[in-house]
């Protein structure tokens, strides 16, 4: 598995969406979960697969009408690494929010 060299907010959103699922998911569900455009999500999924973080397979449900869906799921190593990245992001966001709250004025007016 290759490391992700540029961890962007959209990449973290895709990782988080995949982590939130108990089973393989198709791209449209990732798009809906992240609120990101298909032109953002699918290249991220392709890159994650190329780097060994996730694997994909085609849904072979012959009873379901419509086009086949490509399903995405983590590799064993990818799931652990993704959890670490997403947890680190949450910790950083929480720390930034605490710092912002600590720096806010108390709401009291100071007069001279």
Regions found by a protein language model. Give the residues of each.
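N-terminal compositionally biased, intrinsically disordered segments and leader/signal-like regions
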Residues: 35, 76, 110-112
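N-terminal helix-turn-helix DNA-binding core of bacterial DNA-binding proteins
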Residues: 2-42
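Basic, amphipathic "hinge/linker" alpha-helix immediately C-terminal to the N-terminal HTH DNA-binding motif
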Residues: 63-86
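Glycine-centered, phosphate/nucleic-acid-interacting loop/turn motifs that mediate DNA/RNA or nucleotide
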Residues: 52
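Short beta-strand "wing" residues that participate in macromolecule-binding interfaces
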Residues: 56
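Amphipathic alpha-helical dimerization/coiled-coil segments
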Residues: 80-112
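Short, hydrophobic-biased segments on the C-terminal half of alpha helices
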Residues: 45-49
């Amino acid at each position: 598995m290759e490391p992700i060299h540029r961890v962007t907010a959209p990449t973290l959103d895709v990782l988080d969406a995949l982590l939130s699922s108990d089973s393989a998911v198709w791209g449209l569900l990732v798009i809906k979960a992240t609120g990101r455009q298909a032109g953002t999500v699918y290249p991220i999924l392709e890159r994650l697969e190329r780097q060994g973080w996730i694997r994909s397979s085609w849904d072979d449900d012959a009873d379901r009408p419509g086009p086949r869906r490509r399903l995405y799921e983590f590799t064993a190593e990818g799931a652990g690494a993704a959890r670490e990245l997403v947890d680190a992001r949450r910790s950083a966001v929480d720390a930034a929010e605490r710092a912002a709250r600590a720096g806010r004025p108390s709401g009291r007016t100071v007069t001279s």
